[in-house]
Design a protein with these regions (language model features):
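Membrane-active amphipathic alpha-helices enriched in small hydrophobic residues
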Residues: 263-315
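Conserved GTPase G-domain substructure that encodes guanine base recognition and part of the catalytic core
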Residues: 1-86, 91-271
Length: 315
């Protein structure tokens, strides 16, 4: 499946929008190389933690293609493809010890799988933690025994605490403002610290847990930024075609950082890096930066149509 945005940019390059000769060919070659890339993300967590709702919040599942389950080694894992994105929704853990053992073997098999180049297939793992549950045993066992042993770079592990709105049984969640009040925010900050320290103590891995609410679309941009930064820089642009087109999803985040602007910067930098690394046309990166209006100040007609949904991130 091809990237629609990259197809549009390649078409503009063929028209000479980014120069002619070697610069033009460099952009086209770089785009063609990027179009052959796949970005694989696995979602892991306990039953009821909200893997499906999280995936639906971040990604445009209306156009997702459902993969088959013919591989007996990963029969319980659901695969979705959205252009160059491949999402792996693993079965929930913690309900049945016998099934947990089966699922753990399947998840481990997925995390150990190699692509045609011999590299690990999965680019990152998003481990979801239930913010409403004080019993974190399943979450910690999943991280320690199922995920951590098979991820070479711990920076590729995202710890995301979902259901932050009900972490105190719904108390101190402001429904009108769709955000936690001070008491709940303080409790969630403590949970983040506790989870980080527990993971470090049991695995030796340094993580940066964050909390969000898939139901209320709170801190979805924060989660997306963490996911983008965790993958190789040249692949970060591949998120763009797959994202949820509903601008309301991206509006409400905490104010610790300007997540939406940073997302745009990462997308711009990723495409520039991919093109610069492809051939001698190093100036293509800056040209593409101007070409994409939502990650730069200048609007272009085709780019605006292709990437307009990201404009909601600026809101």
């Amino acid at each position: 499946m091809s990237s629609r945005i990259l197809d549009d940019i390649a078409e503009e390059a063929r028209k000479g929008s980014f120069g002619t000769g070697e610069d033009q060919e460099s952009v086209i070659r770089g785009i063609e190389l990027l179009k052959r890339q796949k970005l694989n993300v696995a979602f892991v967590g306990a039953t009821g933690v909200g893997k499906s709702s999280t995936i639906n919040s971040i990604f445009n599942m209306d156009v997702a293609k459902v993969g088959d389950r013919t591989d007996p080694e990963t029969a319980s894992i659901q695969k979705y493809e959205i252009d160059n994105m491949v999402l792996w929704d693993t079965p929930g853990l913690g309900d049945n010890p016998e099934k947990d053992r089966q699922y753990a073997v399947e998840i481990a098999g997925l995390l150990k799988r190699k692509d045609e180049k011999g590299d690990l297939l999965i680019d990152e793992v998003v481990v979801l933690v239930d913010g409403s549950n004080r019993d974190m045993k399943t979450a910690y066992e999943t991280i320690e025994h199922v995920v951590a042993p098979y991820i070479e770079d711990p920076k590729r592990i995202i710890i995301a605490i979902n259901q932050c709105d009900v972490a105190l049984k719904g108390r101190f969640w402001n429904n009108d403002r769709c955000e936690p009040e001070a008491q709940l925010a303080a409790f969630l900050d403590q949970k983040v610290t506790s989870v980080r320290e527990r993971i470090a103590g049991s695995t030796g891995i340094a993580t940066s847990p964050m909390y969000y609410s898939a139901l209320h679309h709170y801190n979805i941009s924060k989660l997306l930024l963490a996911m983008i930064i965790a993958v190789p820089e040249k692949k970060r642009f591949l998120f763009t075609d797959s994202l949820n087109r509903n601008p309301d999803v991206w509006k409400k985040n905490d104010e610790l950082e300007t997540y939406n602007q940073k997302i745009q910067q990462e997308v711009k930098g990723s495409l520039s890096k991919a093109l610069e690394g492809a051939a001698a046309g190093a100036a293509a990166g800056a040209s593409i930066g101007r070409f994409i209006p939502v990650i730069g100040p200048v609007a272009g007609a085709i780019a605006g149509a292709a990437l307009g949904f990201l404009g909601g991130l600026l809101g």
